[in-house]
């Protein structure tokens, strides 16, 4: 299966009639493995800051998580495993695997729990596969 198929079929899938606003799978070096058409144009330093928070949990809390210039308030995640952010009625979930970051961005009516489930389920599967 191609990386794009993981984004299209697993991240952008429909859940209770809803789906993520955008999603991507990125390498730890900020390279795009696959992304949805409307995934934000991000800066490498934004991805570096996200990776730093996985190594040093809490480092994003004072400044917020930025993706494509959009600031998300960091909310409870799982240190070193998952980072979650909130902005208005939407938010972001980032799951780290050995080689990649799985990123899902959502807005209402999708719920944070639905976004977390989609992103973390794929991340867990990729970890089991050695990625």
Curated annotation (Swiss-Prot):
Q: Which PROSITE patterns match?
A: PROFILIN
* Keyword line: Actin-binding, Allergen, Cytoplasm, Cytoskeleton
Q: Which GO terms describe its cellular component?
A: cell cortex; cytoskeleton
Localisation per UniProt entry: Cytoplasm, Cytoskeleton
Its family remark reads: Belongs to the profilin family.
Cited function: Binds to actin and affects the structure of the cytoskeleton. At high concentrations, profilin prevents the polymerization of actin, whereas it enhances it at low concentrations. By binding to PIP2, it inhibits the formation of IP3 and DG.
Subunit structure of this chain's protein: Occurs in many kinds of cells as a complex with monomeric actin in a 1:1 ratio.
Name-wise, this protein is Profilin
Could you tell me which species this protein originates from? Ananas comosus
At the highest ranks, the source species' classification is: Eukaryota, Viridiplantae, Streptophyta, Embryophyta, Tracheophyta
């Amino acid at each position: 299966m191609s990386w794009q198929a993981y984004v299209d079929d697993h991240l952008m899938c429909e859940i209770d009639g809803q789906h993520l606003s955008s999603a991507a799978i990125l390498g730890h070096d900020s390279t795009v493995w696959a992304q949805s058409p409307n995934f934000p144009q991000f800066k490498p330093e934004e991805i570096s800051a996200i990776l730093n928070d996985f190594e040093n949990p809490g480092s994003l809390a004072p400044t917020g998580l930025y993706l494509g210039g959009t600031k998300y308030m960091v909310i409870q995640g799982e240190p070193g495993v998952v980072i979650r952010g909130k902005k208005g009625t939407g938010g972001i979930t980032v799951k780290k695997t050995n080689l990649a970051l799985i990123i899902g961005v959502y807005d209402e009516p999708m719920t944070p729990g639905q976004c977390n489930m989609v992103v973390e389920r794929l991340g867990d599967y990729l970890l089991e596969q050695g990625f």
